[in-house]
């Protein structure tokens, strides 16, 4: 072998090694790129999920922020309703004016409740007792109604959107 052949052989080996090293580096870099792309996709998805959770928490906080205040107003609404249920039929003009004022106050309170998605839970007589919405305080035998039916409403309940503020207090029928 001549020196020229040896040099060519060495150069060929060096080129092969350089090409192999370059291919290995390219493959490693491609793998790193794919790994980083995957991490970016996962991080982006996590950011989206976090944003959605925060939006949901913000919406719930806004929707239910008045829950405590609303619970305190329920008794006011009950008292206004009771006052209107017991108005005298032969009332004087002054009493009639007071009753009209109480009615206007109750109507205004009902508008505020409606505005803030607070609604009454007033089951129909004979409807099936629902432990999610009703609180049974007693059971009464009644031949005209199925067992576990609402027979009397002692106090209306309320909910704000889908959250219960106060269950309706009811009496239910029992088996005879």
UniProtKB/Swiss-Prot annotation:
Main location: cytoplasm
Biological processes, Gene Ontology terms: protein folding; protein import into mitochondrial matrix
UniProt keyword annotations, A-Z: Chaperone, Cytoplasm, Stress response
A GO cellular-component term linked to this record: cytoplasm
Domain of life: Bacteria
Places the protein is found: Cytoplasm
InterPro entries: GrpE, GrpE_coiled_coil, GrpE_head
MF GO annotations: adenyl-nucleotide exchange factor activity; protein homodimerization activity; protein-folding chaperone binding; unfolded protein binding
Pfam families, alphabetized: GrpE
Disulfide bonds, paired cysteine numbers: none
Record flagged with keyword Chaperone: yes
Keyword Cytoplasm set for record: yes
Xref: HAMAP family: GrpE (MF_01151)
PANTHER family, per database record: GRPE PROTEIN, GRPE PROTEIN HOMOLOG, MITOCHONDRIAL
Function: Participates actively in the response to hyperosmotic and heat shock by preventing the aggregation of stress-denatured proteins, in association with DnaK and GrpE. It is the nucleotide exchange factor for DnaK and may function as a thermosensor. Unfolded proteins bind initially to DnaJ; upon interaction with the DnaJ-bound protein, DnaK hydrolyzes its bound ATP, resulting in the formation of a stable complex. GrpE releases ADP from DnaK; ATP binding to DnaK triggers the release of the substrate protein, thus completing the reaction cycle.
Subunit structure: Homodimer.
Similarity section: Belongs to the GrpE family.
Name of the protein: Protein GrpE
Organism, as annotated: Rickettsia bellii (strain OSU 85-389)
